[in-house]
């Protein structure tokens, strides 16, 4: 009975470690595009979106993972 309990506990711990590792791999790093998956930026980052214009014509929206609490201004 103790062996069965111990085996089940080990399997649960291994499963949790694998899930956590998978979640870490799935995040999008700093300054990478997050247009299709805005909620997947790594921790400490947010997905910030901008409307892109070419010669005054809107060409769609692009989003990038940037640092939280950082504001960028045009030059």
Swiss-Prot record:
Keywords tagged on the record: Disulfide bond, Secreted, Signal, Toxin
Q: Which GO terms describe its molecular function?
A: toxin activity
Task: Output the superkingdom of the source species.
Answer: Eukaryota
Location in the cell: Secreted
The residues that cross the membrane are none
Tissues in which the protein is found: Expressed by the venom gland.
How does the record describe the protein's post-translational processing?
Contains 4 disulfide bonds.
> Per its UniProt record, what InterPro entries does this chain match?
Spider_toxin_CSTX_knottin (IPR019553)
User: What are the annotated GO cellular component locations?
Assistant: extracellular region
Could you say which residues form the signal peptide? Answer: 1-21
- What residue ranges constitute the propeptide? 22-25
Similarity comment: Belongs to the neurotoxin 19 (CSTX) family. 06 (U6-Lctx) subfamily.
Mind telling me what this protein is named?
U6-lycotoxin-Ls1d
Biological source species: Lycosa singoriensis (Wolf spider)
């Amino acid at each position: 009975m103790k062996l069965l309990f111990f085996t089940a506990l080990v399997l649960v711990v291994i499963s949790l470690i694998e899930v956590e590792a998978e979640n870490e791999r799935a995040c999008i790093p700093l300054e990478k595009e997050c247009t299709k998956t805005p909620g997947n930026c790594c921790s400490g980052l947010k997905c910030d979106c901008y409307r892109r214009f070419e010669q005054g014509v809107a060409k769609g929206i692009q989003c990038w993972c940037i640092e939280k609490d950082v504001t960028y201004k045009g030059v």
